[in-house]
A protein has these predicted regions:
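FMN-binding flavodoxin-like domain, especially the glycine-rich phosphate-binding loop
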Residues: 2-5, 16-19, 23, 27-31, ...
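Aromatic-flanked redox-active Cys/Sec active sites in thiol-based oxidoreductases
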Residues: 10-14
């Protein structure tokens, strides 16, 4: 079996979601898959169709909303065909707000509407990731690969 290729598309205002994305990518690499990371402003929604697995990351703006820089990408996703494609969503959020991590939920709903197979629960990290949460992010990346394609030995 050929090594799966995963794409992480994210946006980050404070650097927290970027840090989470990098830790998840580390886990994906450690599990034996290839991974590319793109900032939302450098990504095209059509990129999602070209990869074996996709992960979207965002912070939650205000009271549960997607940030402005994700809106065009989000709307342009409507033309995609993601039937059965493994996907997951993560983000940084603030538990102070009532709709904690609402943007993560919005993206899960969109990917589900487009036919993607959400293989992991949304990962919501409160503000800056702690050392323990960074390890959780690495494990999230490993689980994304292992839950869908099996153990690393399949790719040797």
């Amino acid at each position: 079996m050929e090594k799966p290729a995963c794409l992480i598309v994210y946006t980050s205002m404070s650097g927290n979601t970027e840090e989470i994305a990098n830790d998840i990518a580390k886990g994906i690499n450690e599990a034996g898959a290839a991974v590319q990371i793109k900032d939302i402003l450098q990504a095209d929604p059509a990129d999602l169709e070209a990869y074996d697995g996709i992960l979207l990351g965002t912070y939650t703006w205000d009271d549960g909303n997607l940030p402005d820089e994700f809106l065009d990408f989000y709307e342009d996703m409507d033309t995609l065909r993601l039937q059965g494609k493994p996907a997951a969503v993560f983000g940084s959020c603030d538990s102070y707000y009532e709709h904690h991590g609402g943007a993560v939920d919005i993206l899960i709903e969109k990917l589900t509407e487009l036919g993607a197979n959400i293989i992991l629960d949304g990962l919501k990290i409160d503000l800056t990731p702690t050392a323990e949460e960074k390890e959780q992010c690495i494990q999230y990346g490993k689980s994304f690969v292992n839950d869908e394609w099996g153990p690393f030995s399949c790719f040797n």
